[in-house]
């Protein structure tokens, strides 16, 4: 299939990883096409708050590369390989798409705040010292170069890459490896997913 997204090719994954993911995908989704509802079930994301639900929908849409309303196996592998193995700039491009809820090519303060709150509901960071509001203010004060209250893709990528604290915090807050680990290990991490759902509810 070649480059599926932003220069990230499925060929970079080991055959063992692909086989594991394919087996899990086809077990959970025999049709080969994951709907939003199945996506929630697949990751154990149930009983979420409205903002967390919006984040999950946005994540689904960014994984649905061809915008047909389904995630097929190739989109699924491309998304997971990006999250697990993607280079920093590739991940930042994906984060930007995730934050840009209305799809206008810019992230405003409300969009960022909403997504940060939703991410924390699903995947709480134990070492977070700032509230979601404080973190949003920090991001804008540090990387909104022209002060227009919106972040362009260029401002976002350049600003975050220049600031190790922001890069570390964003990477941690979007660390889906716990959820992905559950996928790879079957249901062993169900308890963690249930805790995340309770924290969000």
Swiss-Prot record:
In the retina, it is expressed in rod and cone photoreceptors. GO terms for biological process: cellular response to calcium ion; phototransduction; positive regulation of cGMP-mediated signaling; positive regulation of guanylate cyclase activity; regulation of signal transduction; signal transduction; visual perception. It is a lipid-anchor. It is found in: Membrane; Photoreceptor inner segment; Cell projection, Cilium, Photoreceptor outer segment. Its main location: membrane. Ca(2+) 2 binds at residues 100, 102, 104, 106, 111. GO terms for cellular component: cone photoreceptor outer segment; photoreceptor disc membrane; photoreceptor inner segment. Changing residue 151 to F: In COD3 and CORD14. Keywords: Calcium, Cell projection, Cone-rod dystrophy, Disease variant, Lipoprotein, Membrane, Metal-binding, Myristate, Repeat, Sensory transduction, Vision. Ca(2+) 3 binds at residues 144, 146, 148, 150, 155. The keyword Transmembrane does not apply. Residues 31-49, 51-86, 87-122, 131-166 form the EF-hand domain. Changing residue 86 to R: In CORD14; results in impaired guanylate cyclase regulator activity; interferes with GCAP1 calcium-dependent transition from activator to inhibitor of GUCY2D; the mutant protein remains active at high calcium concentrations causing persistent GUCY2D stimulation. Gene3D superfamilies: EF-hand. Changing residue 89 to K: In COD3; exhibits an about 6-fold shift of ionic calcium concentration at which the guanylate cyclase activity is halfmaximal. Changing residue 84 to F: In CORD14; affects guanylate cyclase regulator activity resulting in constitutive activation of GUCY2D at physiologic calcium concentrations; altered tertiary structure; no change of affinity for calcium ions; increased affinity for magnesium ions. Homodimer. Binds three calcium ions (via EF-hands 2, 3 and 4) when calcium levels are high. Binds Mg(2+) when calcium levels are low. It is linked to Cone dystrophy 3: An autosomal dominant cone dystrophy. Cone dystrophies are retinal dystrophies characterized by progressive degeneration of the cone photoreceptors with preservation of rod function, as indicated by electroretinogram. However, some rod involvement may be present in some cone dystrophies, particularly at late stage. Affected individuals suffer from photophobia, loss of visual acuity, color vision and central visual field. Another sign is the absence of macular lesions for many years. PANTHER family: CALCIUM BINDING PROTEINS, GUANYLYL CYCLASE-ACTIVATING PROTEIN 1. Stimulates retinal guanylyl cyclase when free calcium ions concentration is low and inhibits guanylyl cyclase when free calcium ions concentration is elevated. This Ca(2+)-sensitive regulation of retinal guanylyl cyclase is a key event in recovery of the dark state of rod photoreceptors following light exposure. May be involved in cone photoreceptor light response and recovery of response in bright light. This is Guanylyl cyclase-activating protein 1. It comes from Homo sapiens (Human).
């Amino acid at each position: 299939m070649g480059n599926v997204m932003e220069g990230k090719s499925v060929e970079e994954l080991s055959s063992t990883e692909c086989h594991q993911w394919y087996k899990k995908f086809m077990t959970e989704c025999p049709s080969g096409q994951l709907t939003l509802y199945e996506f929630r079930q697949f990751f154990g994301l149930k009983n979420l708050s409205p903002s967390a639900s919006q984040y999950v929908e946005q994540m689904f849409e960014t994984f649905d590369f061809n915008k047909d309303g389904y995630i097929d196996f190739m989109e699924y592998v491309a998304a997971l390989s990006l999250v697990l193995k993607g280079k920093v700039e590739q991940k930042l491009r994906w984060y930007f798409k995730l934050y840009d809820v209305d799809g206008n090519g810019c992230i405003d303060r409300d969009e960022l705040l909403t997504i940060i709150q939703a991410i924390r509901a699903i995947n709480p960071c134990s070492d977070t010292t700032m509230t979601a509001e404080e973190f949003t203010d920090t991001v804008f004060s540090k990387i909104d170069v022209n002060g227009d209250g919106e972040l362009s893709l260029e401002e976002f990528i350049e600003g975050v890459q220049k600031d190790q604290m922001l890069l570390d915090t964003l990477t941690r807050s979007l660390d889906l490896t716990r959820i992905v680990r559950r996928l790879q290990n079957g249901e062993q991490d169900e308890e963690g997913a249930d805790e995340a759902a309770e924290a969000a509810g």
